[in-house]
Structure formats: C-alpha cells, structure tokens
Regions:
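Active-site and adjacent substrate-binding regions of carbohydrate-active enzymes
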Residues: 1-559
Length: 559
C-alpha cells in the first residue's frame, strides 16, 4: 500500500461559529481560531477541517454561500484568514477548507442573475423547471430540511430545485461553465495556500437530467434528499475536478457522500486518486435510526449492527481505497451521550473507549471540536433554544402531520439534533465557558456542564480525555501498523464487546472495547499473551491469558 501523508494524519474539525469568540459578539471567529492554535498543536493534530467561513447570509450556518472568495463578516476579514493560515502553517498544521458546491445561497450573484429571465446568461447555472400540466410540482423530491425541494419564483413563473433550504438553490453541474467556475475558485484558494478540501454533499451534484424522475416517498410524503446521490455523471465531474483543480497540488480531499454504498465508495476514493482521497460514509451514523421515523428517534443501537457496518467498510476498502474514521461532526450528536455513557461515573472512561475503538482502525481519524474533552448532549428543554433549521422544521412538519407527538419530537431532536454538536466549545469554567466574554450572549446556549467539562481542566490533568486523545494521536504518528495494517473482526456476535486484530507483516495488535456497563471476561489469543499494552483507559490493566474487561474498558495489546 502506497504511503501518503494524509493517511498518516489526524484531522480536527472546527465549527467556527462555536469555537472561540475573540471580540465578544457571541459568535466564534477566525481570530478566535488563531488564538487556540497552540492548543491544537499540543493535542497533536495535523490538519484542521474548517467548516465554511465564506460570505453568507447564514440561513444554514454558512453552508449557503453568497461569495466563495470573501469571508463572512461575523468571522472577520480575509486578512484575518491569511493570518490564521500562516500561523497554522508555522505550527505545522494544514488547513482543509469546506467546499460547498452542490448549491449556493440565493443571494449569490449567479442566482440573482439567474432568476431575472429565462434567457439570462446565468439561467442555466441552476436547475429550473415549470409546473406539471396539472399545476403540481415538477416532481416529488423533498428537501432534507422538510417540505418539497422546489420553490416557485414568480418572475419567470418557474420552480428552482433546492435539496436543502429554499435559500440554497442547487447548481446545475451539467453546465460546463458552472464546473469551470468551481474549478477556478478552488485554484484561487489553493494558490492562497490552503491544503485541501472537504467537499460537502458532493455525491449529490449530478442529477438525472432532464427527466428528474419521481422517487419513492418517505415519511413526510416526499422523496428524500438522497434522490440524486451517486448520479449519472458524478464520477466524470470529479475526475474533471482532479484534472483541472487538484492535479498540481499535494492536497487532502474528502467527500461527504450521502447515500454512498461500499461499491460507490471504491470509485470515489480508489487508490489511483483519480477522484478523492477518501469519503465520509454515513451507514454507521444510521445504526440507531428507525424505519418509521428515520433519524428522529431516541433508540439505542445494537453493537452487533455497528460491528457489521464498520467491518464491511474496513474489509471492503482494504487495499482498494481509504476510510475516514469518525464518531462526530457538526451534523451528528455527541458520541459519548449517543454511543457511550455520559453519566459522571462513566463519561470520561467511555469517551476514551470510543476514541480507542475508532482510532485503532485503518483510515484517517477525524476529531470534532470538544470530542477530545468528552463534551455531551445539551439539555435544550424548549424549542426556542434550538437554532438548527433541520430540527425546527422537522418538529413542525412531523407534529402537524400527526406522525409524532410534540413530546416525542422534543425528545428526538434533543437526542439527534445537530445543535448538540454546535454548542460553544468549553474552554474553561468561567462565564460562557470561556468561549466568549462574560458580558456576551452566545449565539446558542452553552451546555451548563462546562464547569466540570472544559479544556483548562483537562489539559492540566494526566488522566483526562484530552490527554488520552493526545496519546492515541502520538501512537498513530509512530506506528505504521496502526495506519496501514489490515483489520480482522473477532467476537463477531458479542453484544457488548467490539474486538479486532490489526496486522502488518509480522506485527500485530489486538483491540478490545467494552461498550457496556457489564464486566466481561475474554480469552486472549495465545500469540498476544506475552504482548505489551499500547494503551488502555484503565491505569491498572494487565496482560493475562484471560482478561477481565470492566465497564467501558478499552485495551490495546501489541504482540
């Protein structure tokens, strides 16, 4: 397997609005990020994935871009960005931008022109359709933010497609001029010095045009936003992107690929690097979803399902393509509350167990801000405390349709809502968790547990979650076995324990992760009985023929 720097790296995702506020307006900003680069250097990460900082009216927290070559006013200026980039590079940290090119803001100059007339030069930058003969919508596609994916525009008496909010019209990637605009913009950022791109919902860019056929409807009566996943020209367009925007740069690229299958992922991220370095798949993020309600449920996962999914991706991409490893991001709730145990007794120990489980696999690990502290779900309590369009719209839609009660939906959005990941970073135990000045009002509520979960405490404490992540990252930097070794699942049917073996040549390690409060005994394979402990979340762990795994214990033994 060919060695590449991005395979050996650990990526840290920053959601700028919630990371660090330098000017007291309650909103995180670029200068706040710059002020915390030493913290990230101490953690040991190699790359920052920066969620969107471009000019935006902020309908969807920056994923609605009105100018790709300017900075959102709330985040600072281009000079602030340049200073952050230069400072990160001085500290040996690369910057990966969030590339949002399935859609723009409806306030982008392209769309402002596009909607003016049917013969405007920018008309075909977007996807416009008339109503059907009976006056109904062009098709039954739905927005992932609830409701239909079509918005009527009276100026030309036509509808435009938006797979997300109605302020996020989809670009028409079948137009070669649009593609060149995107490639030119990417090259502009690469010339500025950025090190790569995380590509938002990139699997959705190619639609089945001109037909745009109806699809199977979901719970709300519309076909879901995966209607255009892995479309007819997506691989062709990404190969063109590689040739026209990425070929001259040693970049890191990861595609967020909604609806991606294992076979499709092999095409996106195959080792010949004609498209992307790796993809984000979401199958393991649906492990606790419900057939009826989709993600809007509070049900717990069955560990055996998780093992099947992650093992299929580990084995399926082995020697063919490259995995992205993650529990959290800005769209997913906090992993320690979701997959671990966020009680005072087990929060830190289970956060370390989850980290061990994912960081010992083959692939590039991603750490989301606050994950390295074991940040938890936030008790939002009332709908007014939520900020995320997806949660608010789903609440109204599903309760008004009688599909779920208000009580059920409040529980569901409290458990699965994206705002769980977006509460302010907990820096210390001062007012507003040190995210913002004491007199500021943060844009979203601070989790009240910041007095006991914060970076200041954890950086100073040797047994903290932060220090454990630091050790895991250091181990990966030092070990080809962890980075490049093959993966084999053991104890397949065990409902409590996730265990697997990594192999590279004559080197081997075994990983045990107890996902439960149960104490369990396992028999260590003979080849490991003389091995050494690489890392464990219990200080007194020992190697023996039979290992007793305490609640949420993780242990890694190298032979």
């Amino acid at each position: 397997m060919e060695k590449r720097w991005w395979k050996e790296s650990v990526v840290y995702q920053i959601y700028p609005r919630s990371f660090c506020d330098s000017n007291g307006d309650g909103i995180g900003d670029l200068n706040g990020i710059t002020s915390k680069l030493d913290y990230l250097k101490e953690l040991g990460v190699d790359v920052i994935w920066l969620s969107p900082v471009y000019k935006s009216p902020n309908d969807d927290n920056g994923y609605d871009i009105s100018d790709y070559q300017d900075i959102m006013d709330e985040f600072g200026t281009m000079e602030d960005f340049d200073r952050m980039l230069a400072t990160a590079h001085e500290k040996g940290i690369k910057i990966m931008m969030d590339l949002v090119v399935n859609h723009t803001s409806d306030e982008h100059k392209w769309f402002i022109e596009s909607r003016k007339s049917t013969d405007n030069p920018y008309r075909d930058y977007y996807i416009w359709r008339p109503a059907k003969e009976d006056g109904s919508l062009p098709n039954n596609w739905g927005s992932c933010f609830s409701g239909p994916a079509w918005e009527y525009d009276k100026t030309t008496d036509m509808y435009f497609l938006h797979l997300f909010s109605k302020k996020q019209p989809d670009l028409n990637w079948d137009n070669p001029v649009v593609r060149q605009e995107v490639f030119d913009m990417m090259n502009w950022w690469l010339e500025k010095g950025v090190d790569g791109f995380r590509m938002d919902v990139i699997s959705l860019i190619s639609k089945e045009q001109p037909e745009l056929p109806d699809k199977e409807p979901g719970i709300n009566g519309y076909a879901t936003f995966n209607v255009s996943a892995n479309g007819p020209h997506v691989h062709e367009y990404l190969q063109e992107m590689r040739q026209k925007a990425l070929n001259n740069a040693d970049t890191i690229t990861v595609g967020e690929c909604s609806g991606v299958t294992l076979e499709e992922a092999k095409k996106y991220a195959r080792s010949d690097e004609k498209e992307l370095n790796m993809v984000f798949q979401f199958e393991h993020m649906d492990v606790d979803s419900d057939e009826k309600a989709g993600k809007w449920t509070t049900r717990k996962m069955d560990l055996r399902d998780l093992k099947k999914i992650l093992t299929r991706w580990q084995k399926g991409l082995q020697d063919i393509a490259w995995n992205s490893l993650y529990w959290e991001n800005h769209d997913q709730p906090r992993s320690v509350s979701r997959f671990g145990n966020d009680s005072d007794e087990y929060r830190e120990i289970s956060a370390k167990m989850l980290a061990t489980c994912i960081h010992m696999m083959q692939g590039t690990p991603y750490v989301y801000q606050g994950e390295e502290l074991g940040m938890t779900f936030c008790p939002f309590n009332t709908l007014e405390n939520f900020r995320d369009l997806e949660s608010i719209n789903a609440f109204h839609e599903l309760t008004e349709q009688g599909k779920m009660t208000e009580e059920e939906m409040m529980a569901a959005i409290g458990y699965k809502g994206r705002d769980n990941a977006r509460t302010p970073m907990q820096w210390d135990d001062s007012a507003n968790a040190g995210f913002s000045g004491a007199d500021a009002t943060p844009w979203i509520m601070v989790n009240p547990n910041y007095t006991k979960i914060n970076a200041k405490d954890q950086v100073s404490r040797e047994d903290s979650v932060f220090k454990y992540y630091q050790k895991l990252i250091k181990l990966r930097h030092e070990s080809d076995l962890i980075v490049y070794g093959t993966y084999d699942l053991i104890l397949d049917d065990d409902k409590d324990i996730y265990a697997y073996i990594r192999t590279l040549g004559d080197e081997k390690l075994i990983v045990y992760c107890n996902f439960s409060e149960n104490t369990r005994e396992v028999e260590l394979p003979e080849e490991f009985t003389d091995g050494k402990i690489l890392i464990s979340n219990y200080n007194d762990a020992k190697v023996s023929e039979k290992i007793t795994l305490r609640p949420y214990e993780a242990i890694v033994i190298q032979k």
